Amino acid sequence: MPDTHVVTNQVPPLENYNPASSPVLTEALIREGGQWGLDEVTELGALSGSRQAQRWGELADRNQPILRTHDRFGHRVDEVEYDPAYHELMKVAVGHGLHAAPWADERPGSHVVRAAKTSVWTPEPGHIC
């Protein structure tokens, strides 16, 4: 479909950026003993700002979870059906230790590294609650 006009009053999509590139975040990680996690935080930040992760966030927000209380035979099942994008977001979050890494890692600064990862993993914040 050809463009009908030039749109000049809208910002471009915010994608392919790294929220972990903040010098303030880097300084805080180093100061609080989490320098060992800089590479992990940077890697997660790059994924967070990617077009793919932004799309997952958009789909997860657009397609709300569906509560299924009973199956087709009337048996109680109480399950929640999530969009596959929500599962992708969760897979990344759990894979990077956002759920419990500091309690399994005794290195100094482990809570700071987790906090930094949580702050940069921003495509859709509801799945971290």
Language-model regions, residue ranges each:
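Extended, charge-enriched "interface" segments that sit outside catalytic cores
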Residues: M1-R107
